[in-house]
């Protein structure tokens, strides 16, 4: 028998974006072919999709770690990398997606509804896409962004029309087994039912879904017994059925006190709910009372004696049944179908399935200077933190082994206004500035126009000294005259220094 799993924690890692390519077009008789490096492919997304063939979260219980494929790197001749294949995870209808803080992100109630649980990283731009008037043939490309990585909680709330509630051993499992094709475990001891059971009840040509949850006891809304874990399965039900054991011999218990105790637990659970199901609060939903075990003579006598009192006190319809003898079930079925049909008419019409997407907020150029802030670094006296989505993404895209790429990053940060704000915040040349996970020694940069003469892959602004030293001029002259070999530095300390400077 398959286990019913209604809560799991998923560890998700979407695919990383592919890196852009650095390439220069080479063709006969075309000496200035220009850059032709392609862009990297988008990383694969992780998507949750509601499937009618799935009824539990069991698969995720055994395989909670999920990783999507990465995008392919770009290539020369303007060839973009392939997009990483999206990974689709099928979930049952009624799945609620929460983040690690317990905040609801999506409620998947309709077959075919999709939710992008983790977005893949954007592919990096190739040098062809980075060409500009200042950089006609960039010698660098952008790295792909990493895919989103986080944990999500999936909770399953049954999409049943009728919910059976009652004390342990009240006969709920027996009742659902004779009213539907469900085959729950049945025993003559408390808490036989350890997981919710669902069954489809047929009434003529009409059907409705019934849910049997584990028995509730006083304090269930506070975590006692098994009730707290399974009360979520009655949140979406249109009608609640109190199944009362009229044959119970427990001291201090009677049908009316059982109903009052269960109503108190439902009211306490309702106060913790913040979801609008369109059905109203639990305390306002229709109720039906089922006095069970009428096959026992004493129980039948007690049920007939209390039936009028219960109807008068609570105002709910009361049915006397025997699940074992299968007596009194048809009137109960028709009454439940009538209430369910009325509730379905009142329920708001479901919208067409829509994809709910978790992704970085769109960038609005008009708010460019409001998209980051400068803070004092609490762990580094005299240091500064640049906090913002856009600069942190740029850090991830930068290849720090390439000076030209670093210079491009500096230009982007300056254009965003980071340098101006750092200067106003008191940053000085040499101050340590941290963006994302990278720390720099801040030095104000000149305009990107000055880099036009830089060889590919370099940025003259990053050189320690733009002037050629006397030793370098002397050595270049000796090489031209053939007095020394270009790679012959000789021996000794002076030669070592010249080798390092050259």
Curated annotation (Swiss-Prot):
Residue span(s) of domain Obg: 2-159
Gene3D superfamilies from the UniProt entry: GTP-binding protein OBG, C-terminal domain, GTP1/OBG domain, P-loop containing nucleotide triphosphate hydrolases
Domain OBG-type G: 160-341
Binding site for Mg(2+): 173, 193
Domain (OCT) ranges: 364-444
InterPro entries: G_OBG, GTP-bd, GTP-bd_Obg/CgtA, GTP-bd_prot_GTP1/OBG_C_sf, GTP1-OBG_CS, GTP1_OBG_dom, GTP1_OBG_dom_sf, OBG_GTPase
Positions of GTP binding: 166-173, 191-195, 212-215, 292-295, 322-324
GO process annotations (BP): ribosome biogenesis
Entries under Pfam families matching the protein: DUF1967, GTP1_OBG, MMR_HSR1
One cellular component (GO) term of this entry: cytoplasm
Keyword check for Transferase: no
Cofactor or coenzyme needed: Mg(2+)
Molecular function as annotated in GO: GTP binding; GTPase activity; magnesium ion binding
Domain of life of the source: Bacteria
EC number of this enzyme: 3.6.5.-
Assembly and binders: Monomer.
Job of this protein: An essential GTPase which binds GTP, GDP and possibly (p)ppGpp with moderate affinity, with high nucleotide exchange rates and a fairly low GTP hydrolysis rate. Plays a role in control of the cell cycle, stress response, ribosome biogenesis and in those bacteria that undergo differentiation, in morphogenesis control.
Family to which this protein belongs: Belongs to the TRAFAC class OBG-HflX-like GTPase superfamily. OBG GTPase family.
Protein name per Swiss-Prot or TrEMBL: GTPase Obg
Organism of derivation: Corynebacterium efficiens (strain DSM 44549 / YS-314 / AJ 12310 / JCM 11189 / NBRC 100395)
Lineage: Bacteria, Bacillati, Actinomycetota, Actinomycetes, Mycobacteriales
Gene of this entry: obg
């Amino acid at each position: 028998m398959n286990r019913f799993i209604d809560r799991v924690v998923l560890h998700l890692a979407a695919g990383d974006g592919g890196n852009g390519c650095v390439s220069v077009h080479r063709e006969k008789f075309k000496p200035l072919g220009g850059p032709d490096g392609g862009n990297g492919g988008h990383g694969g997304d992780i998507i949750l999709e509601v499937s009618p063939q799935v009824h539990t979260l069991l698969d995720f219980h055994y395989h909670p770690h999920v990783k999507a494929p990465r995008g392919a790197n770009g290539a020369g001749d303007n060839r973009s990398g392939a997009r990483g294949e999206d990974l689709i995870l099928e979930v049952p209808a009624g799945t609620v997606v929460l983040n690690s803080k317990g905040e609801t992100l999506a409620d998947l109630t309709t077959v075919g509804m999709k939710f992008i649980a983790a977005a893949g990283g954007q592919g990096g731009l190739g040098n062809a896409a980075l060409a500009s008037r200042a950089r006609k043939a960039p010698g660098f490309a952008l790295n792909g962004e990493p895919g989103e990585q986080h944990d999500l909680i999936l909770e399953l709330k049954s999409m049943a029309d009728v919910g059976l509630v009652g004390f342990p051993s009240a006969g709920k499992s027996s009742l659902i087994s004779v009213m539907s094709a469900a085959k729950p475990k049945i025993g003559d001891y408390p808490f036989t039912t350890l997981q919710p059971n669902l069954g489809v009840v047929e009434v003529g040509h009409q059907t409705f879904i019934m849910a049997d949850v584990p028995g509730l006891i006083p304090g269930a809304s506070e975590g006692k017994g098994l009730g707290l874990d399974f009360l979520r399965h009655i949140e979406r039900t249109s009608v609640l059925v109190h199944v009362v054991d009229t044959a119970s011999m427990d001291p201090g218990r009677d049908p009316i006190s059982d109903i009052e105790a269960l109503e108190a637990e439902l009211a306490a659970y309702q106060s913790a709910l913040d979801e609008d199901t369109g059905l109203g609060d639990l305390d306002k939903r229709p109720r039906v009372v089922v006095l069970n075990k009428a096959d026992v003579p004493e129980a039948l006598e007690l049920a007939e004696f209390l039936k009028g009192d219960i109807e008068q006190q609570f105002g709910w319809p009361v049915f006397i049944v025997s699940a074992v003898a299968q007596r009194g079930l048809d009137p109960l079925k028709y009454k439940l179908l009538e209430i369910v049909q009325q509730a379905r008419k009142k329920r708001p019409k479901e919208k067409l399935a829509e994809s709910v997407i978790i992704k970085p907020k769109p960038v609005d150029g008009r708010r460019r200077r409001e998209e980051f802030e400068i803070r004092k670094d609490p762990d580094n006296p005299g240091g500064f933190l640049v906090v913002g989505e856009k600069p942190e993404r740029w850090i991830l895209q930068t290849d720090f082994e390439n000076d030209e790429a670093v210079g491009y990053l500096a230009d982007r940060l300056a254009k965003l206004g980071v340098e101006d704000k750092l200067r106003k915040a008191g940053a000085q040349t040499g101050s340590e500035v941290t963006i994302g996970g990278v720390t720099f020694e801040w030095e104000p940069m000149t305009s990107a126009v000055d880099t036009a003469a830089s060889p590919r892959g370099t940025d003259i602004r990053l050189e320690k000294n733009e002037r050629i030293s006397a030793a370098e001029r002397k050595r270049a002259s000796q090489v031209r005259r053939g007095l020394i070999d270009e790679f012959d530095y000789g021996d000794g300390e002076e030669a070592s220094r010249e080798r390092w400077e050259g």
